[in-house]
Amino acid sequence: MAVERRTVGIGYLRWLRDLWVRRDNRWVRRYNRTAPKLLCIHSHEGAWNAYNPAGPYYGSLQMDSSFMWAYGADKLAKYGGRDARYWTARDQLAVGFRAVRARGFTPWPNTARACGLL
């Protein structure tokens, strides 16, 4: 059975490129606004592999297990249920972005005040 090939016009390809550029720009703008704020929280909370046994809180954003399940269940599955101190910095920031989108900076009240975010 032969596969029919369709040619795509240059207009469609330009439209598709522009669509992806617009979507990418929207994400970049959102990232550029939030990333420095999360990095400020990171600088106050600890290293990427930080562990606070008194909490227990894990990772540089000091996430507890309920926080990780709420905003990073896919990351928990990716790392086989291991806590955030074993996650990459990129994965920890991705979970932080989700939390900021949902709740603002309230999960880190004292640190957010120190960073001037609350």
Which residues does each predicted region cover?
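Peptidoglycan cell-wall recognition and remodeling modules
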Residues: 27-118
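Cell-wall glycan-active module
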Residues: 1-34
